[in-house]
């Protein structure tokens, strides 16, 4: 009996002491949290030169640009709510001017089975931008086009089409003044890799194939009005505003990968240390 009680006690103490130890940063968690107290968030970019295959590409890019402006403040709000940072600021720079100024190159990558676009930015321009805004690091978020193979099922789940589909994806990095990438999205430090897309630009037209008694299912692009309606679907935020459901899915995923380490009771793991230190002063 004493042995069982002791084992349970040791397990409980271990959970209280270590919590969930997973680190999603490219540096040790404690180093990141000490280094990045004030985070700047650049206005969300759209990379019109990426793999966006929609026949009305210009209209689509303009639509994304408009929705970036409408929703980017919610990303800042969600990052603030993590409690990881002392302050999170949305930079006031113009996204269309800032992106080409900062961009060094883009690479199509396939890492650990995840296809994505990785962005590289000019160190000197980044250093200047951070100094101008008085932030410790900056988060750079880019909406881009990406084509990847998928198996998509019909609404009745009886048929599927495995093909290459064009998507709107989101890539992001948190970079310091020395140009070091401290955190990135997609994030390869997850136990189970996941990389949700912002929006599927194409769909398999099962209904047309059925209507024409055909086994040939065409892959079609969604219309601009249809895409606009999808982006316009809103949900309430924790504040008084609203955010597009599409963006909220991505923002929530990003914010979850920047949560501070928690103890068993849901508090920050370092809260006890901070309170103890304050009491000794």
Please annotate each region the language model reported.
Residues 1-9:
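Bacterial N-terminal signal peptides that target proteins for export
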Residues 16-19:
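C-terminal motif of bacterial Sec signal peptides marking the signal peptidase cleavage site
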Residues 21-35, 40, 49, 148-151, ...:
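C-terminal/domain-edge helix-coil "capping" segments
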Residues 24-77:
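Start-of-domain marker
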Residues 25, 119-126, 153-159:
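N-terminal post-signal-peptidase region of extra-cytosolic proteins
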Residues 44-47, 142-148:
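Generic short beta-strand segments
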Residues 54-145, 175-195, 200:
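N-terminal segment of the mature soluble domain
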Residues 58-61, 154-162:
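Short helix/strand-bridging catalytic loops that position acidic/His residues to coordinate divalent metals
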């Amino acid at each position: 009996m004493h042995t069982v009680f002791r084992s349970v006690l040791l397990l409980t103490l271990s959970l209280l002491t270590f919590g969930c130890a997973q680190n999603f940063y490219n540096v040790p968690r404690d180093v990141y949290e000490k280094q990045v107290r004030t985070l700047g968030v650049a206005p969300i970019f759209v990379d019109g030169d990426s793999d966006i295959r929609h026949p009305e590409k210009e209209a689509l890019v303009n639509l994304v640009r408009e929705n970036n402006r409408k929703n980017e403040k919610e990303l800042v709000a969600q990052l603030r709510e993590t409690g990881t940072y002392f302050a999170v600021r949305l930079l006031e720079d113009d996204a269309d001017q800032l992106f080409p100024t900062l961009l060094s190159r883009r690479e199509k990558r396939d890492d650990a089975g995840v296809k994505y676009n990785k962005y590289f930015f000019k160190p000197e321009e980044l250093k200047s931008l951070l100094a101008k805004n008085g932030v410790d690091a900056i988060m750079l978020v880019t909406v881009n086009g990406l084509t990847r193979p998928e198996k998509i099922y019909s609404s009745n789940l009886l048929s599927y089409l495995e093909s290459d589909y064009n998507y709107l994806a989101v890539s992001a990095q948190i970079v310091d003044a020395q140009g070091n990438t401290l955190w990135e999205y997609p994030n390869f430090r997850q136990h189970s890799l996941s990389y949700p897309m912002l929006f599927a630009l194409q769909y398999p037209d099962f209904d047309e194939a059925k209507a024409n008694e055909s086994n040939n299912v065409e892959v079609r692009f969604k219309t601009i009005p249809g895409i606009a309606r999808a982006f316009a679907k809103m949900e309430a935020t924790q504040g008084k505003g609203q955010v597009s459901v599409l963006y909220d899915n991505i923002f929530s995923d990003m914010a979850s990968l920047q949560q501070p380490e928690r103890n068993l009771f849901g508090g920050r793991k370092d809260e006890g240390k901070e309170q103890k230190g304050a009491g000794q002063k």
